[in-house]
Amino acid sequence: MGPALGAEASASAQQPGSDTSLYARLGGIFAIAAVVDHFSDAIIRDPIAGARSANPALRRWHTRQLDRLPGLKFMRTLWVAAVSGGPFHYTPTRPGASNLGLEAAHASLRISPREFDAVAAVLTRSLDHFHVPAAEKQEVLAAFAAHKNEVTQGWRAAQPGH
């Protein structure tokens, strides 16, 4: 299945200046779901953000709440499909200050900037696993990085003197 995503994304990619959505260039919902599935499983094994994390909230989530992982994979897939220009609408399960609700969804996990960066590295490896072309990979990673402040807001709020 790995090369299929890269082949689909390459086949659907347009020349620079095209108005083809990132969703289409990634290969659509099935290709996005494959990457999200791989990515979600890989986070659990990550030493910084996964089941052995120094962060007790992340460690607890990745060891005691894995029954929620299928739903989280669905929500992540829906979120990526929606924000990449696909024909889907994402509604956060915990609405927050932003329309995506990322700060509310992640606040109790107190994700640090280092942990966020570790998850970004996991995402990079998942995109590489599926041979996502460089341009699309950079768009996905930039979109992910754009939400760092929202995702790490709970950690920042818990810091002394904040």
Predicted regions and their residues:
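Core of compact, soluble alpha-helical bundle domains
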Residues: G2-H162
